[in-house]
UniProtKB/Swiss-Prot annotation:
Record field: transmembrane: 3-23
Protein name: Galactosylgalactosylxylosylprotein 3-beta-glucuronosyltransferase 2
Catalytic activity: 3-O-(beta-D-galactosyl-(1->3)-beta-D-galactosyl-(1->4)-beta-D-xylosyl)-L-seryl-[protein] + UDP-alpha-D-glucuronate = 3-O-(beta-D-GlcA-(1->3)-beta-D-Gal-(1->3)-beta-D-Gal-(1->4)-beta-D-Xyl)-L-seryl-[protein] + UDP + H(+)
Protein family (similarity comment): Belongs to the glycosyltransferase 43 family.
Chief location bin: Golgi
Gene Ontology biological process terms in this record: carbohydrate biosynthetic process; carbohydrate metabolic process; chondroitin sulfate proteoglycan biosynthetic process; protein glycosylation
Gene designation per UniProt: B3gat2
Intracellular or extracellular location(s): Golgi apparatus membrane
Entry-linked InterPro entries: Glyco_trans_43, Nucleotide-diphossugar_trans
Pfam families: Glyco_transf_43
Source organism per UniProt: Rattus norvegicus (Rat)
Length: 324
């Protein structure tokens, strides 16, 4: 009896399963899409059961994000104050050599603009070609020194320095002045790169020692408690500013705020050009000592030796005209 019931049950079981499956199928539900990619939900469960979008990742992007997370976020660097170097120059056998040495130094200084002023009525081909190849931001000016001022005992380069000052003021006349520093870079000086780092932080007028000047190994401002209190110099200690032209820098804002400050011809005694200029824009108490409280020499008034051209032929010249 039991055997007969079991046989009937097993015969009916497949039909019962078929009926259950047919009842469970909803003909209105679309069939699932077949895909070669593994299926995953585009959301993940967040706090409180909320569904949060799940971002897909790629190996390249994950690696870049890891690098960015480990790298500190750098703030944009403030713009360096521009250093304006005014260089008077005049024609002579060593002119190109002097300018080459100076350009090799300036080329290593960031954010420097070279204002080269020739002592002549027109621009020379030598200086124009030189500046075109110098690889430096530059301005080429020219102004001749009046004949009556070309005396050995009179100050030189007065008109040229004033031309550089006039160009700066005109350039910034109708625009807000960017941070900048001005200094007078004669072409017969030698400069340490450290000097440019020192002068770039000038707030008003900064000063430092100068080597090989005034008949001494160096001249310098005397400093006490961070203030200039006197001058170590070999000539006229009574000068208001007993300093060489290579021994100071001036903020661009000070130059623009004092439009009448220039180098004077009339009423200026020999050797007093620096003092007469600085008196118009500052006082000794306001000077900012640089170069470790004026105890380091970072600029030298080297002066190229006067060349001996006694053997230069007057006749039977070389057939090739070489620029020197």
């Amino acid at each position: 009896m039991k055997s007969a019931l079991c046989n009937r049950f097993f015969i009916l079981l497949p039909w019962i399963l078929i009926v259950i499956i047919m009842l469970d199928v909803d003909p209105r539900r679309p069939a699932p899409q077949l895909t070669s990619r593994p299926y995953f939900s585009p959301h993940t469960v967040g706090c409180g059961g909320s569904r949060v979008p799940l971002r897909r990742s790629s190996p390249g992007r994950d690696a870049a994000e890891k690098r960015n997370e480990s790298r500190p976020q750098l703030q944009p660097e403030p713009r360096l104050p521009t250093i304006y170097a005014i260089t008077p120059t005049y024609s002579r056998p060593v002119q190109k050599a002097e300018l080459t040495r100076l350009a090799n130094t300036f080329r290593q200084v960031a954010q420097l603009h070279w204002i080269l002023v020739e002592d002549r009525a027109t621009r020379s081909e030598l200086v124009s070609s030189f500046l075109a190849r110098a690889g430096l931001p530059n301005t080429h000016l020219h102004v001749p020194t009046p004949r009556r001022y070309k005396r050995p005992w009179l100050p030189r380069a007065t008109e040229q320095r004033n031309a550089g000052l006039a160009w700066l003021r005109q350039r910034h006349q109708h625009q807000s002045a960017q941070p900048g520093v001005l200094f007078f870079a004669d072409d017969d000086n030698t400069y340490s790169l450290e000097l440019f780092q020192e002068m770039r932080t000038t707030r008003k007028v900064s000063v430092w020692p100068v080597g090989l000047v005034g008949g001494r190994r160096y001249e310098r401002p005397l400093v006490k408690n961070g203030k200039v209190v006197g001058w170590y110099t070999g000539w006229r200690e009574d000068r208001p500013f007993a300093i060489d032209m290579a021994g100071f820098a001036v903020s661009l804002q000070v130059i623009l705020s004092n439009p009448k400050a220039v180098f004077k011809r009339r009423g200026s005694q020999p050797g007093m050009q620096e003092s007469d200029f600085l008196k118009q824009i500052t006082t000794v108490d306001e000077l900012e000592p640089k170069a470790n409280n004026c105890t380091k020499v970072l600029v030298w008034h080297t002066r190229t030796e006067k060349v001996n051209l006694a053997n230069e032929p007057k006749y039977h010249m070389d057939t090739v005209n070489i620029e020197v």
